[in-house]
Amino acid sequence: MSETHLSNQKFADFSLQTEIKTALNESGFEYCTPIQALSLPILLQKKDIAGQAQTGTGKTLAFLVATFNHLLTTPIPEGRQLNQPRAIIMAPTRELAIQIAKDADLLAKHTGLKVGIVYGGESYEVQRKVLDKGVDILIGTTGRIIDYVRQGIINVSAIQAVVLDEADRMFDLGFIKDIRFLFRRMPDAKSRLNMLFSATLSMKVQELAYDHMNEPEKVEIAPNEKTSKNIKEEIFYPSMDEKMRLLLTLLEEDWPDKAIVFSNTKHSCEKLWSWLEGDGHRVGLLTGDVPQKKRIRILELFTEGKLDVLVATDVAARGLHISDVSHVYNYDLPDDCEDYVHRIGRTGRAGKKGVSVSFACEEYALNLPAIEEYINHTIPVTNYDSEALLDDIPAPVRVHRKHNSRPQGRSGSGGKPRSGNRNAPRRHDKTRRHS
């Protein structure tokens, strides 16, 4: 979580428990973001909300503060058993669940409340041992939560607070039946604090809210501004032959500290990885085929700055919660307009500036009109000089090579780094962009 100064509302002005205020202060949080300033007054009155907010707006901190405060100010259910958590936070992806849990740990340290996390792809027994000790706040993906519920390892009949994060993504991934399964086994909606957050409050999301919540109040943040003003957007029209050279040239020119390159298919991502690796970049690959432990390790290296570029499909697009991403490159324009918003939302977060670069090639240029209509603005076109593109590009690494999750490229293995570190001399000193 990162501090932002996007409103004049201070956390200190809310009637929060001292333990929470102390944790917020220690973590450097003083001012609220708009979603926090709007939602917390409602939630602290123990009223439900359905919030529309993009990732990077501070919604995670909003619902975590509300959840912790609710548990600290609400009596523990009489006869509560060790296998009965008091709050449950459901997320669509493992990466998002992991990030929420990290943020929850910051708030939990003075409260005495125990946080547990469960998700697929990791040891069932290791996670079960944590649950056997009892948790107050359970964070996880619905599939793994249901596994434990069906086996009696978790009982949700004492739940006092529920969070459903990125509800629209839940629909996209087909998790709604799982969610309804869990809701039916919880106490009545009127006896819980219910929170739903979604990038879009579509009719199907609102229906879910009203079916399983207690007259939630709708909270919307800039509904007509689907992309952040902190993100500088630009689009290029490369030929298929020049597309890869243009990307490598722009990466050389921009020299981003932390960049994500999105492509529409696993095959294309693997191709991108092989060229970037061969060109000496420290690059990680995230697709649906990457094993869970490796995914976590790659994200850790990227977060720590030991990888500079992450190549990803949309499987990872909405689950990535990484601070300080300076650039997003849409190597392919997405087929789904919402995916464009979610992709570029990885940068320009927490009040910081970001850059989004998109390629409208022959194959995907037809997606652009729908995207621009959806985001309510035209993306500025940037021209480039074909003759100025890099031509001394090393051959790509063979795709079948095992993708190491250790740091690569400019400071280590894989490809030939230009001089072994981030201070390697660049291959040009003039811009390739032309207005």
From Swiss-Prot:
Q: Which UniProt keywords apply?
A: ATP-binding, Cytoplasm, Helicase, Hydrolase, Nucleotide-binding, RNA-binding
This enzyme's EC code(s): 3.6.4.13
State the Pfam families in the record.
DEAD, Helicase_C
Question: What SMART domains does this protein map onto?
Answer: DEXDc, HELICc
Question: Sorted alphabetically, which InterPro entries does this protein's record hold?
Answer: DEAD/DEAH_box_helicase_dom (IPR011545), DEAD_box_RNA_helicase (IPR050079), Helicase_ATP-bd (IPR014001), Helicase_C-like (IPR001650), P-loop_NTPase (IPR027417), RNA-helicase_DEAD-box_CS (IPR000629), RNA_helicase_ATP-dep_RhlB (IPR023554), RNA_helicase_DEAD_Q_motif (IPR014014)
- List GO molecular-function terms, semicolon-separated: ATP binding; ATP hydrolysis activity; RNA binding; RNA helicase activity
Please state where this protein is localized: Cytoplasm
Query: Which reaction(s) are listed as its catalytic activity?
Result: ATP + H2O = ADP + phosphate + H(+)
Looking at the record, the residues that make up the Helicase ATP-binding domain are 40-219
**GO cellular component assignments:** cytosol
Where are the stretches annotated Disordered?
395-435
Record motif DEAD box, residues: 165-168
Query: What PANTHER family does the database record attribute to this sequence?
Result: ATP-DEPENDENT RNA HELICASE RHLB, ATP-DEPENDENT RNA HELICASE RHLE-RELATED
Family the UniProt entry places it in: Belongs to the DEAD box helicase family. RhlB subfamily.
| Protein known as | ATP-dependent RNA helicase RhlB
Q: Which species is this UniProt entry from?
A: Shewanella sediminis (strain HAW-EB3)
